[in-house]
Amino acid sequence: FINCVITGSMPNEIMISDTTRSTPLKYSFDHCYLMSNPIHSPFIKNVLWGNTRDQLFVRSAINKDGYYDFRPTEESLLRKKADIQISRLPAFCFDMNDIYRLWENAPDIGAYQWPGK
């Protein structure tokens, strides 16, 4: 996972364990926001460890129409923390709303880029 957000209403949204021990667990997190207690692993780098008090999105609670709004706020911890090399790749230089990620030369973590004022 690169430039990803894994969050939710629980204080520990992700746990990594190999219960079978028969095949090595393969994973990697880089430039991500993880709602979890810190996990120490050589496969995890440049991660922001979250907590339930973090205000990341425009609306992280469902509205009356049944929708969330996962665009980052201007003050979001996700702002300007993505891996710029990955964000420069043609497949990732625009967000889910077709906003150019590199307009500030500092892309945001997650599926959406803060659009500016």
Model-derived regions, located:
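Predominantly extracellular beta-rich ligand-binding scaffolds that present long acidic/polar faces
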Residues: 1-75
